[in-house]
């Protein structure tokens, strides 16, 4: 056996996984932006509406950062698509959002742990911290209205 195949696989697999993960992150943020617009419109009061719009603005920032990373890795613009539909009822939407944010924290930390540059690591670590904060707010509103 020649060990070179393993080195080749190790060298080229990780960046492809990174590209796929960044593309998945772009789509996730794109979906969240769409969903949080709907949730903000269903909010029970102005304070909740404003907080959800602030969360949405964080998602726009993440979306833009992830797009830039995708372009730097591939040389082309991503073609974002909605990958998860937002529930039509407010309470269901809050539950959906808090679960999605929690899963996203883990996903972004995995990307940060395996990323190839410090810039990518830092962007995803910061985004993971933001997502954790978002989950807390969604949990608060979900618990409040349940």
Short names for language-model regions:
Residues 1-146:
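Non-heme di-metal
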């Amino acid at each position: 056996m020649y060990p070179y195949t393993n080195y080749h696989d190790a060298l080229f697999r990780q960046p492809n996984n990174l590209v796929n993960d960044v593309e998945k992150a772009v789509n996730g943020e794109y979906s969240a932006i769409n969903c949080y617009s709907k949730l903000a419109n269903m909010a029970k009061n102005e304070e909740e509406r404003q907080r959800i719009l602030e969360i949405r603005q964080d998602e726009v920032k993440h979306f833009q950062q992830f797009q830039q990373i995708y372009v730097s890795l591939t040389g082309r613009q991503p073609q974002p698509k909605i990958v998860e539909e937002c529930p039509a009822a407010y309470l269901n939407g809050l539950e959906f959002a808090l679960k999605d944010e929690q899963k996203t924290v883990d996903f972004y930390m995995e990307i940060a742990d395996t990323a190839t540059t410090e810039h990518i690591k830092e962007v995803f670590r910061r985004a993971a911290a933001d997502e954790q904060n978002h989950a807390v707010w969604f949990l608060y509103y979900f618990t409040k209205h349940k």
